[in-house]
Regions:
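A generic structural signal for short, non-catalytic loop/turn and secondary-structure boundary residues
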Residues: 62, 129, 202-204
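Catalytic strand-loop segment that frames the active site of acyl-thioester-processing enzymes
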Residues: 16-18, 29-110, 217
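Hydrophobic beta-strand-centered segment that forms part of the acyl-chain substrate-binding groove
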Residues: 104-105, 110, 115-160
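Short, intrinsically disordered/low-complexity patches at protein termini
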Residues: 27-30, 91-93, 133-134, 140, ...
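HotDog/MaoC-like acyl-thioester-processing domains
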Residues: 1-41, 46, 147, 154-222
Length: 222
């Protein structure tokens, strides 16, 4: 058998008794970045940039660059429930409004996988010629998303990775999604200091995802 996917997932579970210890110090040690040694990179030949409408290749991106994705997308109740069913997620927090009416939010929460999907779709407007994801290094659903929220996103280029091939390279990207604020019109702080002095994600930030994307090099252009 050949392994095609492996990931570590942390889930939020309500405590029956708030005083129950969390054993936070028992978390296993994990690498900060996924190893690309086991990633199967496709071969790219005669890449037709005219089909994508983009002229930026691996060499044209630089660490420290921020790419704003201009489009926004409003989440609708029916579509996020349909998508969640397709993901085979049956958690009541996403479907049962009668139950959620008594919760602290009073509403159904949009499934985090749908938030990732929307943010990744928005990123295609600005990330030119990216072929797809190779690995996730880590990520956080930082605040809940609800139907009626409008999502925007930006990508920070953390690293340009040369895998030793002439036709393809990789970019380490940080994809951030925010709700109900357009980052092209006003600044959005990623994190803010709380009343207790601890740093927390801004209330409008809903996703912080660190991943590796594949992108052709200029030599592969047809």
């Amino acid at each position: 058998d050949e392994r095609v996917l492996q990931f570590y997932r942390w889930v939020m579970v309500n405590k029956r008794a708030p005083s129950t210890p969390t054993h936070a110090d028992s978390a296993p040690d994990m690498p900060a970045q996924a190893s690309l040694d086991q990633v199967s990179f496709p071969h790219v030949a005669r890449f037709d940039a005219s089909a994508t409408g983009g002229d930026r290749f691996w060499e044209d991106y630089a660490a420290g660059e921020r790419i704003a994705h201009p489009q926004g997308m409003t989440i609708e109740e029916a579509e996020h429930q349909m998508a969640t069913r397709l993901y085979q997620n049956t958690a009541r927090v996403h479907f049962n409004q009668l139950q959620q009416s008594a919760s602290r939010h009073g509403r159904r929460i949009v499934y985090g996988g749908h938030v990732i999907s929307v943010a990744h779709a928005l990123s295609f407007d600005g990330l030119e010629n990216v072929l797809g994801m190779a690995a996730w290094n880590g990520g956080s659903h930082t605040n809940p998303t609800f139907a009626g929220d409008t999502l925007f996103a930006w990508s920070d280029v953390l690293e340009r990775i040369d895998i030793g091939r002439d036709d393809i390279g990789a970019l380490r990207l940080r994809l951030v999604a925010v709700k109900n604020v357009d980052p092209s019109r006003e600044d959005v702080a990623l994190k803010v200091a709380g009343e207790d002095g601890r740093e927390r994600y801004h209330a409008n930030v809903v996703l912080d995802l660190d991943y590796v994307a594949l992108i052709p090099k200029r030599a592969a252009a047809g």
